[in-house]
Each structure stands twice: as C-alpha cells, then as structure tokens.
Amino acid sequence: MKVLRTYYIFLLSSIVISQENEAIKYEDLYERKGLIYASDQDSTFNGTVNENWPTGIKKLSYTYKNGKPDSKWSDWFNNGQPKEEVEYSNGIKNGLHKKWYKNGQQKFERTYKNGIHDGKWTEWYENGQSMVEGNFLDGKPDGTWIYWYPNGQKREEGNPVSSDTSSLAFLNDGIWNYWHPNGQLKETGNYISGEKDGQWFEWHDN
C-alpha cells in the first residue's frame, strides 16, 4: 500500500507539472477590468508567453505578474532581427524602451520611470544617422534638444517645454537655431511658450 500511495502522489505531481508547463499562446489571454487572464484560468495570469513565427524564428516573449506586464517584453521581426524591447514593473513602463527597423538599425531608445519619461531620449533614421537627441526630467523635456536631417546635418536646436507629462506636444522656448540641409544657418531667434518673440534673423542657402 505504501508503494501504491507513493506512485499515486507521483502521478498527481506529474499531472500538475504538465499543466503548468503547457504552452499558453498570446491569443489565449484576455483582459478583464484592466488585468490579464488565461482563457482556462479564474485567477490573474502569471508567467511568460513565448511565440514563434511559422519558420520557427522567435516572435515574442511577454511576462506577466498578477495579470500585469512585468520584466522585459521582447518582439522580433520574421527575419530574426529584434523589433522592440520594453521594461515593465507592475504593469507600467519602468526602464528602457527600445525599437528597431527591420534592417537591424535601432529606431529609438527612451527611458521611463514609473510610467513617465525620465532620462535620455534618442531617435535614429533607418540609415543610422541621428534624428533626435534630448532629455526628460519627471516627464517633461529638460535642457537642449537637437534634431538632424537624414544626411547627418543639424536641422534645429533649442529648449522645448511642456506642462503635460502625458503628452509629447512640446512648445519651443528661448533661443532656437535652424539650419539648411547643406549645413548653413537658416534662422535664429527667440520663443516664448511657442510664440516667436523679438527680432529673428534669416539666411538663404547658397
């Protein structure tokens, strides 16, 4: 009897382990009141969902904790190149958010702190040239931001401002400089809360 009881316990344990290891697809998840559940579970979903493209190349890897996004989420293009990575904590972005073009060139890199932008913000063109570089502090643009043309020439430079931490709609403020695509200075002047103020100077490209 002791041997049978041991075998029975082992069998039950095997069934539980088999159920826990059974692959859950992203399409099997659903949202209820802002939390994620698996279609065959009553409690919020805990675990990682992994899926591949039909070719066998990895497509996505998402982790949930108590029904909320958690840890690093990753997506890949069907050619195997990384597409996007987002770091979550308790359902909100907290850490780095990266995205790539299909050719493998990075598209942007942003930093979040408790769901709002905080830290360096960088964007690139598909050819690898810098597009935008700036910084956030507590959800608002901080300091000088620089923008470039696809050919690598500087396009504009100045200090944007914003009063809304949930919006990326900025207002130019202070001295701003603009350049032509050939690198020659185009325009310079002062802004006050998005409105041009005082004397502005302009130059034609040669």
Identify the residue ranges that each predicted region occupies.
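Glycine/tyrosine- and acidic-biased, solvent-exposed loop/turn segments at the edges of beta-strands
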Residues: V16-N206
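Bacterial Sec-dependent N-terminal signal peptides
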Residues: M1-E22
